[in-house]
């Protein structure tokens, strides 16, 4: 499984590594294009790799789900990302996702990774619950009595100073 961010250079691509920021993603909606890959033969059928995406506050992740992949090629450009490889059976997998493209329908091989999904609106409610929890803790910890007068401390220190000076 490969997880690729959409603002990294090919020099930064490593198996299982992720980079990217949502503001760099620039996707209106993902689109797919099944253009013929230059090295593909007519005898072998090409398929799309199952692709998952999810986002975080600073990153957008794309995972191309392929086990035992070989001949992995990733092309990242300003307007698209192209992923191709061969699986263990020798079947060529090819995905091309263009950015800023208008999409009429969602490709069947692209789906949301709900295991990593976060509801950003729900996070605000959760943070508010944490703030309320801390406010309750502070109420429990705070004392409702007035602080001690400490008049005795001043008297003792003065008498101790007087005794040493005599």
UniProtKB/Swiss-Prot annotation:
Q: Which molecular function term from Gene Ontology is one that the record holds?
A: Hsp90 protein binding
Gene Ontology CC entries for this record: cytosol; nucleus
Chain positions covered by the region annotation Disordered? 142-166
Quote the Gene3D superfamilies the UniProt record gives. 2.60.40.790
Q: GO terms for biological process?
A: chaperone-mediated protein complex assembly; protein folding
| SUPFAM superfamilies from the UniProt entry | HSP20-like chaperones
Q: Where is the composition biased (Acidic residues)?
A: 151-166
Could you tell me which residue ranges the CS domain spans? 46-154
Q: Where are the transmembrane segments?
A: none
Q: Which family does it belong to?
A: Belongs to the p23/wos2 family.
Name listed for the protein in its UniProt record? Putative protein PTGES3L
Name of the coding gene: PTGES3L
């Amino acid at each position: 499984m490969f997880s690729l961010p959409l603002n990294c250079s090919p020099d930064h691509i490593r198996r299982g590594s992720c980079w990217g920021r949502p503001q760099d993603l620039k996707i209106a909606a993902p689109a797919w294009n099944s253009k013929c890959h230059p090295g593909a033969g007519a005898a072998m059928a090409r398929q799309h790799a199952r692709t998952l995406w999810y986002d975080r506050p600073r990153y957008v992740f794309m995972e191309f789900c392929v086990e035992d992949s070989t001949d992995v090629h990733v092309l990242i450009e300003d307007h698209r990302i192209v992923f191709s490889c061969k699986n263990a059976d020798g079947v060529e997998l090819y995905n091309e996702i263009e950015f800023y493209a208008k999409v009429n329908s969602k490709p069947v091989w692209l789906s949301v990774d709900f295991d990593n999904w976060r509801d950003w609106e729900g996070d605000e409610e959760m943070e508010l619950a944490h703030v309320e929890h801390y406010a309750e803790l502070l109420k429990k910890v705070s004392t409702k009595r007035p602080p001690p007068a400490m008049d005795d401390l001043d008297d003792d220190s003065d008498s101790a100073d007087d005794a040493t000076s005599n």
